[in-house]
């Protein structure tokens, strides 16, 4: 598994990496978050020696395909059947399945994967513990769970408020968006409830106190 197969964010920002903050609607390319989290996630997967990976909430499948290009065997799942049809049409060599992370794990996926990745999913579900339970059910013993979500810390929240951008982050009028707003303390507390091992935490994108996102990786018991 090679991180070197990832394109550098400096190589071709108009093609490989997004230069827009908008994530609305289906499009074939990466979402803005992928520019920050892809390399750290692949590094965690490589460090764990993972081969089989489940990509929860894969959306248009860009990240799923990026993992395949890095040498992983990947299944991308999402609840949105229409989006997955387009993802499959755009990426015919990548495997996708319709799956609702709020429901029981489908037959055949239990304890099947070396790693489960969920990019910006846990803060978009009403019941985040259920999402974690579904992810852990798919892991082999000793498998790696990698979760990312938007970072919300005191300094960043204060800066947003002073800049007059607070409402853009907590806009109740959006038809879609985050329903949970995690800090480092409550995200790591949530993961700790499941008695996982070797927890790793890092912020990504910008300096730590104003980080774009945060990443938690931890192993299920052997």
Give each language-model segment a name.
Residues 69, 126, 140:
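Short conserved AdoMet
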Residues 105, 142, 153-155:
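Feature marks short, surface-exposed loop/turn motifs that line or immediately flank catalytic pockets
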Residues 193-196:
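A structural motif corresponding to the C-terminal end of an alpha-helix
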Residues 82, 126-130, 157:
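Short N-terminal helix/helix-N-cap motif within the alpha/beta-hydrolase-1
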Residues 115-121:
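A short beta-strand submotif of the Rossmann-like class I SAM-dependent methyltransferase core
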Residues 147-168:
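Conserved class I S-adenosyl-L-methionine
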Residues 1-111, 115, 131-132, 147-149, ...:
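Conserved N-terminal segment of class I S-adenosyl-L-methionine
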Residues 130-141:
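A short glycine-rich, Lys/Arg-flanked "PGG" loop and its adjoining helix->strand segment in the class I
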């Amino acid at each position: 598994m090679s991180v070197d197969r990832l394109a550098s964010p400096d190589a071709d920002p108009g093609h490989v990496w997004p230069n827009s903050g908008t994530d609305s609607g289906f499009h074939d390319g990466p979402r803005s978050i992928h520019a920050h989290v892809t390399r750290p996630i692949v590094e965690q997967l490589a460090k764990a020696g993972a081969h089989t990976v489940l990509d929860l909430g894969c959306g248009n499948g860009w990240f799923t395909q990026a993992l395949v290009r890095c040498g992983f065997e990947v299944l991308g799942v999402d609840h949105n059947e229409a989006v997955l049809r387009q993802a499959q049409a755009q990426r015919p060599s990548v495997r996708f399945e319709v799956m609702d992370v709020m429901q029981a794990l489908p037959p055949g996926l239990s304890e099947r994967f070396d790693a489960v990745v969920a990019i910006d999913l846990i803060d978009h579900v009403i019941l985040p513990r259920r999402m974690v339970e579904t992810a852990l059910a798919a892991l082999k013993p000793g498998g790696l769970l990698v979760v990312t979500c938007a970072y919300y810390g005191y300094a960043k929240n204060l800066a947003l408020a002073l800049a007059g951008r607070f409402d853009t982050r907590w806009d109740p009028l959006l038809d879609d968006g985050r329903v949970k707003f995690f800090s480092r303390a409550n995200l790591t507390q949530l993961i700790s409830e499941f008695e996982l091992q070797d927890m790793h935490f890092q912020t990504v994108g910008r300096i730590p106190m104003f980080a774009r996102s945060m990443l938690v990786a931890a192993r299920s018991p052997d």
